């Protein structure tokens, strides 16, 4: 009934394929490798309970009250301290903005910056929720292939030059340089610096999504691109969903003070501010060292699960498949033989009791028909083995028909 009343922008909104998949698996004997949920055993439950009790006993008048749109000042100062652990310096609370998870940050930033027809560079593949948020702005996507080392920077320069030769500048590049979702790839430090040089040379902004920056479990996590930013060209976002608890719905943005003011104006007209109680809980979790002390456990749990998944893939996937070997994050991305369409194969996989996310959702042009994203952070180890076995059987059956 209401479709004829909807705005044009609303009609561009797309449902989350991942959440649709999770609905399909509810109440069924299906091992879901589809979601991106943290492992609940990594949640510091008792510590959060103690913090919440202390806050409600001593600071309820503030924690349950309205607060500043950009976030509680004390909390933003703690976020400056937390960001130093990722190598970001030379900032203060005026460069920090608190959001309802990094998802709100994505939506706000794309709406603040993008007009219809703007050239936006994205990785291929990239985070599907970011693509969906951008689509409402109707940009022109320029897709850059993700290699084992991250986005192909030679291809990036070539495509930017092509755009310039046609009189079209690039406005923004959205990039996930560390433990990329979905590909699991991590850019090295030199490539990060080179990307920043390219952005400066061709005068575009970089939107850096560092959701998994703290979750590198093999080797050192490279500093974010923001750590090398001298021009204020990088807009950086991260989240507490992966390092504390997703139910708090907390993220943050680090950017030039002028852009933070634009975010403040936008959020005032959307939801006033991010929930105060969640901010107080996260602030105390930083102050008491709970987040910092819990990171080794999170990394250990995810490394063990990644190893289990990779071993199972080696055992059960066909020889002509290939997949990433992530050094952090939550996901493995796989490329199957070209004859397989993973969207069409999904129903058969569900019948065998396993779910994954078809890879075409992660491409701006919906290519990648033979790809899939599989998650290792949430399922139990035995579920990972059995789930990959079921998935391998499905793939082999598909190849034989």
UniProtKB/Swiss-Prot annotation:
Superkingdom of this protein's organism: Archaea
CDD domains: AAT_like
One cellular-component annotation, GO: cytoplasm
Gene3D superfamilies referenced in this protein's UniProt entry, alphabetically: Aspartate Aminotransferase, domain 1 (3.90.1150.10), Type I PLP-dependent aspartate aminotransferase-like (Major domain) (3.40.640.10)
Cofactor: pyridoxal 5'-phosphate
Keyword Membrane recorded: no
Keywords: Aminotransferase, Cytoplasm, Pyridoxal phosphate, Transferase
Top class in the EC scheme: transferase
GO BP annotations, alphabetical order: alpha-amino acid metabolic process; biosynthetic process
A Pfam family hit: Aminotran_1_2
GO molecular function: pyridoxal phosphate binding; transaminase activity
Subunit structure: Homodimer.
Family affiliation: Belongs to the class-I pyridoxal-phosphate-dependent aminotransferase family.
Protein name: Uncharacterized aminotransferase SSO0104
Native species: Saccharolobus solfataricus (strain ATCC 35092 / DSM 1617 / JCM 11322 / P2)
């Amino acid at each position: 009934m209401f479709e004829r009343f909807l705005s044009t922008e609303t009609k561009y909104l797309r449902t989350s394929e991942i959440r649709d998949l999770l609905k399909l698996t509810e109440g069924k004997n299906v091992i879901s490798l589809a979601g991106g949920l943290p492992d609940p055993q990594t949640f510091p439950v008792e510590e959060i309970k103690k913090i919440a009790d202390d806050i409600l006993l001593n600071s309820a008048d503030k924690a349950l009250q309205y607060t500043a749109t950009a976030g509680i000042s004390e909390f933003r100062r703690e976020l400056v301290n937390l960001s130093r652990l990722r190598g970001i310096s030379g900032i203060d609370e005026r460069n920090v903005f608190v959001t309802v998870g990094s998802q709100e940050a994505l939506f706000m930033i794309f709406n603040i910056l993008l007009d219809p027809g703007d050239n936006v560079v994205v990785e291929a593949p990239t985070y599907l929720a970011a693509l969906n948020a951008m689509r409402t702005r109707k940009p022109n996507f320029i897709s850059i292939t993700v290699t084992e080392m991250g986005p192909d920077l030679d291809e990036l320069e070539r495509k930017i030059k092509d755009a310039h030769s046609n009189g079209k500048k690039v406005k923004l590049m959205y990039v996930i340089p560390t433990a990329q979702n979905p590909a699991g790839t991590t850019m090295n430090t030199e490539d990060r610096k080179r990307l920043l040089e390219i952005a400066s040379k061709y005068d575009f902004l970089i939107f850096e999504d560092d959701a998994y920056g703290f979750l590198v479990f093999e080797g050192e996590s490279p500093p974010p691109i923001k750590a090398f930013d001298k021009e204020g060209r990088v807009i950086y976002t991260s989240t507490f969903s992966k390092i504390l608890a997703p139910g708090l719905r907390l993220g943050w943005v680090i950017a030039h003070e002028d852009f933070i003011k634009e975010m403040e104006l936008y959020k005032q007209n959307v939801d006033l501010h991010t929930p105060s109680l969640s901010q107080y809980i996260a602030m105390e979790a930083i102050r008491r060292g709970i987040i910092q002390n819990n990171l080794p456990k999170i990394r250990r749990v995810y490394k063990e699960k990644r190893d289990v998944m990779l071993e199972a893939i080696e055992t059960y996937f066909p020889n002509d498949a290939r997949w990433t070997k992530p050094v952090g994050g939550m996901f493995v991305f796989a490329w199957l033989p070209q004859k397989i369409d993973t969207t069409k194969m999904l129903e058969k996989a569900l019948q065998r009791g396993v779910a994954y996310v078809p890879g075409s959702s992660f491409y701006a042009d919906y290519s990648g028909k033979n790809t899939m994203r599989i998650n290792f952070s949430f399922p139990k180890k035995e579920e990972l083995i059995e789930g990959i076995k079921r998935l391998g059987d499905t793939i082999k059956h598909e190849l034989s028909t």
